[in-house]
Amino acid sequence: MAKTLTIRYTSDTHGYLYPTNYADMQDRPMGLMKLASEYPHDGNTLIIDGGDTIQGSPLTNLYQRLSPEEKAACLSEDTYGTHPIAAMMNLAGYQFVTLGNHDFNYGVDALMDYLTNLDALCL
């Protein structure tokens, strides 16, 4: 009996959650929220990210500049302490990630904040 395996792969999302280009505020076919809404969770699909994930958008740049107190004020109780990109990737069902060079831009502490909140296995 033949089975089908589908691989969904992202790379270089650079912290974009929303399908919006902030320069002109137009919807685009981009962003983790747009992509994740299309992922099947059927047991036959692997969802993988190739890195350069946590740096580059206005959201991730702001997140890295917030103090722990400011993060607590912005996040609800059920998401407090969860890196926003990790939270979205967890909801999307990512199973595996690798790291890209830009994932190191904010330093080791920021990278570990992301990885420790991520359900996916970092290869």
Predicted regions, residues:
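Acidic, metal/ion-coordinating pockets
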Residues: 1-123
